[in-house]
Design a protein with these regions (language model features):
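N-terminal targeting sequences that direct proteins away from the cytosol to non-cytosolic compartments
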Residues: 1-74, 135-137, 154-158, 168-202
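Conserved polar/disulfide-associated segments of primarily extracytoplasmic proteins
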Residues: 48-179
Length: 202
């Protein structure tokens, strides 16, 4: 008789269900023009009233819930980190089974990431950085969005930082989102929707 074994994978809280009212529309009308949907949970414009910062935006609710988004020149160092994170990761194997045992199901693969994130040059208040996940998706205009999910410390608290990266017309569109690690199920859907809402004038 075959004994069914439950795979030893960590249980995650369900991801938050997001709604249109969780976001508001933002557009930068300079060069390069871009627009995207910003999550209200990341707070208010911290650059309001300051001299124009160009095609960059910043929002913050606190020292541990904040985001930036910018249109910049392509950074080959950052591009290399995104690429190497996927190339150099190692799959974490499931423990071997005993005689007459099989897993109830095969879970999604989990990985160890061996790429050093130090060259990313994150803001100084973000420390103890380690890559914990990486992947890619598509925007509404079918641009590739790359993601890096980082475990880090911000303002003395265990946080997650998510980097997003898209390219068009030799420009990079880069996001940085920081939030408490324990609340990642609330924030990751917001980050994903914002990154995939990017539209860039051709």
């Amino acid at each position: 008789m075959i004994k069914k074994i439950k795979p030893p994978v960590p249980e995650e809280k369900p991801l938050r269900v997001i709604w249109p009212q969780d976001f508001y529309y933002y557009s930068y009308n300079g060069d390069p023009y871009y627009s995207l949907s910003l999550p209200k949970d990341f707070g208010t414009d911290t650059l309001a009233g300051l001299p124009a910062a160009g095609p960059m935006l910043m929002r913050a609710q606190s020292n541990t819930v904040l985001m930036t988004f910018a249109a910049t020149e392509n950074d080959p160092v950052k591009n290399r980190i995104f690429s190497e994170a996927l190339k150099n990761r190692s799959e974490i194997p499931l423990p071997p089974l005993g005689p007459n045992e099989e897993y109830e199901y095969i879970p999604a693969p989990r990985y160890t990431y061996n790429t050093d994130p130090a060259p990313l040059e994150l803001p100084k208040q973000i420390t103890n950085v380690k890559i914990v996940d990486a992947g890619s998706g598509r925007t509404a205009e079918n641009l590739i969005v790359q993601y890096l999910y980082l475990s880090c410390t911000a303002d003395g608290q265990h946080c997650m930082a998510v980097l997003t990266h898209s390219e068009r017309n030799q420009k990079a569109f880069d996001g940085l989102f920081v939030f408490p690690y324990a609340e990642k199920q609330n924030y990751i859907p917001l980050v994903t929707f914002t990154a995939q809402s990017l539209r860039v004038r051709k």
